[in-house]
Regions:
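A short helix-to-beta-strand connector/capping loop
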Residues: 18, 41-44, 133
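Class I SAM-dependent methyltransferase "Motif I" SAM/SAH-binding loop
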Residues: 2-6, 111
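Conserved SAM-binding loop of SAM-dependent methyltransferases across substrates and taxa
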Residues: 5-18
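Mobile active-site "lid"/loop adjacent to the S-adenosyl-L-methionine
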Residues: 29, 48, 65-95
């Protein structure tokens, strides 16, 4: 989702995926994505659709994918946009998590330098709770070493990519031994 010129979808097909669908609202980017797929001799379905609407449609119809990749454009370019970016990242990740088959993979990205990795992980934790799933994060990465960042400008560490398995939430994961339970009267 937010496929832009198709990099993730095309790479998935080249790596052996059975199918890939790229979703974006940018018609020019989708045209380029189609050309990129042709140049790489892979078949990818590209759709000019609002990502939020598409994910809502999927979950409404009970449709899920083995892998969902969320790579939106920068959502917070200035301090005034941070609160809205938190809500948007929360919404898109909740929907994305609901669209992943149990045990499937979610790759979610943020290129907003004003959203720290810690904040992004907090957003994902909240989104997982709202989606009724548990995330098992197995990799967190960012820009490669050709994108150095300064200690006095942490926003330069703008790219965050979180790879996680998505599992349905069951109370079993959070059962504590009886002597460790916390109650209102404790």
């Amino acid at each position: 989702c937010f496929c832009y010129t198709g990099g993730f979808a095309i790479s998935a097909m080249l790596a052996g995926a059975r199918s890939a669908t790229g979703i974006d609202l940018d018609e020019d980017a989708l045209e380029t994505a189609g050309e990129n797929a042709r140049l790489n001799s892979v078949k990818v379905t590209f759709q000019h659709v609002n990502v939020f609407d598409h994910l809502r449609m999927m979950t409404g119809k009970g449709m899920q994918s083995d892998v969902v990749i969320l790579d939106p454009a920068k959502l917070a370019g200035c301090a005034e946009e941070i609160k809205r970016a938190h809500r948007t990242y929360g919404d898109i990740n909740r929907l994305g998590m609901q669209a992943v088959k149990p045990g499937g993979i979610l790759l979610t990205c943020s290129c907003s330098g004003l959203i720290s990795e810690r904040d992004f992980l907090s957003i994902l934790t909240r989104s997982a709770a709202e989606a009724g799933v548990v995330l098992q994060i197995f990799k967190i990465t960012g820009a490669s070493s050709d994108h150095p960042f300064s200690t006095v400008f942490p926003e330069g560490r703008y790219l965050k990519a979180v790879f996680a398995r998505v599992f349905p939430f069951t109370k079993k994961e959070f059962n504590f031994p009886k002597n460790e339970r916390v109650t209102k009267n404790s």
